[in-house]
Amino acid sequence: MKQLRLEPINKVQGTINIPGSKSISNRALLLATLAKGTTTLTNLLDSDDIRYMLASLKQLGVNYRLSNDNTVCELEGIGAPLNSEQAQTLFLGNAGTAMRPLCAALTLGHGEFTLTGEPRMEERPIGDLVDALRQLGANVTYLKNDGFPPLTINATGLDAGEVEIAGDLSSQFLTALLMVAPLATGDVNIKIKGELVSKPYIDITIALMAQFGVQVVNHSYERFEIKAGQGYVSPGKVLVEGDASSASYFLAAGAIKGGEVKVTGVGRMSIQGDVKFADVLEKMGADIEWGDDYIISRGSTLKAVDLDMNHIPDAAMTIATAALFATGTTHIRNIYNWRIKETDRLAAMATELRKVGAIVDEGHDYISITPPTKPHTADIDTYNDHRMAMCFSMLAFADCGITINDPDCTSKTFPDYFNQFAALAQ
């Protein structure tokens, strides 16, 4: 197994241009496919999850051209549902942002489509989405365990009507349903069962749909209306914002060991909810400055916080390791959906934080972290989870340094992360 040793870093300073957002990249690729016209996507994320989406689209007959660095994609929209005369099997790795939307999109046309992935994907739920698609006439069959991939879709189109979908596990289910609703046979009204998690990710979806010419009526995140007759039309160009979750590591670095760290590509004008991570750092005592397309974080003495972080589930992981440098016990609440991500992130985070000496209380949907007087070094397991690797890079700010096992798992969203991180060290 590959290991990466991070020696202690005394100070960070510099500017980082954040690579494109995973959430926006894969949504935009699918909408561009369904739209009339050619779309040029710039600042597209070059990572595993995006490559799985692109490979699947190519297999389904979508034409696109990528720049040499894979960050500009010119894609010819088909302006219609995806169809295939031959049965297709699509391998989607562990990319939830490809699996869930494609599962929905492939019900719209005609053909037989089997969706598979890595072993962890077979443990990541998709049942709430499939239940909703079945209410609109979709024919979806599970191949192993009910409610989980792999699955086969026998597509004949999607009916209009009322549909209920659970919102308490993952916002990706609703995102997938929203994106395909305009191509159903008539009006679609979506009712949310339970409390909708990660609402800012739904805002991203609705904003991107609007860019492609489709309006969604949002009734306080309890009901959504999508009128028939709205087809997707390419806006010509789409700039993919920097990934706000990826920005969190550099902003935290500035707060812990700044100096001053400026991240560009996200800012006040961002459509991503995870930019609110900077507000949490500010509550912890960091000095934060906002621009339209940048955020600056400056070092300060940090104190613990006790917050509901359901709205920033990915970036909240960075607070868990930043808490090691704050005075007091930090409580991160309402984060059950950590358990159904790339790994069970609540269990993984608790295990690895204890390795460096933290006192941790892991609950059903919360984690509480009391830092040790002095963190100690450890070999950190990353569970094939990119965010675990990036979060624990914060331990380079302790006097002992840290060793990251399987550091290349960051290729899921940020292949160049550790080089960029090292570039900030003074």
From Swiss-Prot:
One of its GO terms (biological process) is chorismate biosynthetic process. Pathway: Metabolic intermediate biosynthesis; chorismate biosynthesis; chorismate from D-erythrose 4-phosphate and phosphoenolpyruvate: step 6/7. 3-phosphoshikimate binds at K22, S23, R27, S170, S171, Q172, S198, D314, N337, K341. InterPro entries: Enolpyruvate_Tfrase_dom (IPR001986), Enolpyruvate_Tfrase_sf (IPR036968), EPSP_synthase (IPR006264), EPSP_synthase_CS (IPR023193), RNA3'P_cycl/enolpyr_Trfase_a/b (IPR013792). The keyword Ribonucleoprotein does not apply. One of its GO terms (molecular function) is 3-phosphoshikimate 1-carboxyvinyltransferase activity. The keyword Secreted does not apply. It is found in: Cytoplasm. Its EC number is 2.5.1.19. It catalyses: 3-phosphoshikimate + phosphoenolpyruvate = 5-O-(1-carboxyvinyl)-3-phosphoshikimate + phosphate. Phosphoenolpyruvate binds at K22, G96, R124, Q172, R345, R387, K412. The active site is at D314. Keywords: Amino-acid biosynthesis, Aromatic amino acid biosynthesis, Cytoplasm, Transferase. CDD domains: EPSP_synthase. GO terms for cellular component: cytoplasm. PROSITE patterns: EPSP_SYNTHASE_1, EPSP_SYNTHASE_2. It is an enzyme of class 2 (transferase). Catalyzes the transfer of the enolpyruvyl moiety of phosphoenolpyruvate (PEP) to the 5-hydroxyl of shikimate-3-phosphate (S3P) to produce enolpyruvyl shikimate-3-phosphate and inorganic phosphate. NCBIfam families: aroA (TIGR01356). Belongs to the EPSP synthase family. Monomer. This is 3-phosphoshikimate 1-carboxyvinyltransferase. It comes from Shewanella sediminis (strain HAW-EB3).
